[in-house]
A protein has these predicted regions:
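Acidic, glycine-rich A-domain
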Residues: 1-268
Length: 269
């Protein structure tokens, strides 16, 4: 029997998922410091890595804005479908959502260092309240918290990385929960839409179930556990992936976070 020995650490890969939301403003600097340390560690040990920032603002990167619309406008994003086709009862993913690949082990060292500098200067522009001495990308503002959408997308990112390696670890860096998830509904079934687009959404609550179309397994959902159930669903399909989520909070924020979590645990959703 032939045995192939793979050097420890050479068959692992890391995917970092960074929260690019407005509430990260006060802690983005320290978060980037830790992220850069992890990236340098991966480079030193030759571990493949990808870093993505999740946002609902950078949809503007791949489209030109109308002259009569400000670049901050979210108009017409509902038509920017990020899935093959709109389906009723699917989890809704807004057209403005994007996963931006900001760092990659595939890039040259010189390019990675340049991009780190760009990210650091972008952080400085937020830290100093958009001071003109630190310009920032006009189409890459801090935004909302589409964490659930990001988790859904990690499945495809993991599958892509697993083509060359055996185990993938997903590291999530965020300061809080995702914004309230929703699912697609056909509004024409409930009332006359008067010629308007019949595609609508409803908030996910305790009456909803998440169904894995591949395995048929279902997962009970509430307002507060959607992120955990999405991760569980991915791990059931891809057992060689692990998730590590860090809740990043600023000094003195532990009490607020604990109170918020307790409120969701006792609220009858």
């Amino acid at each position: 029997k032939k045995v192939t020995t793979i050097p420890d650490g050479k068959n692992h890969g890391l995917i970092f998922v960074l929260d690019w939301s407005g509430s990260m403003n006060n802690i983005l600097e320290d978060t980037l410091k830790q992220l850069f340390q992890l990236v340098w560690f991966c480079k030193k040990t030759q571990i493949p890595y990808e870093v993505y920032a999740f946002t609902n603002d950078s949809w503007q990167l791949n489209k030109e804005c109308d002259e009569d619309q400000p670049y901050t406008s979210y108009r017409n994003t509902s038509s920017d479908l990020l899935v093959d086709a709109w389906k009723e009862n699917d989890i809704n993913i807004d057209g403005c959502f994007r996963m931006v690949n900001i760092l990659s082990s595939k890039a040259r060292t010189k390019d990675v260092e340049k991009q780190m500098l760009n990210l650091w200067l972008t952080n400085c522009s937020f830290k100093y309240h958009y001071n003109h001495h630190f310009p920032h990308p006009a189409k890459f503002h801090l935004s909302g918290t589409p964490l659930n959408e990001a988790i859904i997308c990690t499945k495809q990112l993991v599958k892509q990385m697993m083509k060359k390696i055996q185990k993938v670890h997903v590291i999530i860096l965020t300061d809080g929960e995702a914004h309230q998830p929703s699912y697609n509904v056909d509004r024409s079934k409930f009332y006359d839409s008067f010629g308007l687009d019949h595609k609508g959404t409803r908030s996910i609550n305790s009456t909803c179930m998440l169904r894995n179309r591949k395995s048929g397994k279902t997962y009970g959902l509430t307002y507060s556990n959607c992120s955990l159930k999405l991760i569980e669903c991915i791990k059931d399909d891809l057992p060689d992936v692990s998730f590590i989520a860090f809740r990043v909070i600023e000094r003195g924020g532990m009490t607020v976070s604990y109170t918020h979590l307790r409120a969701h645990e006792t609220q009858p959703y």
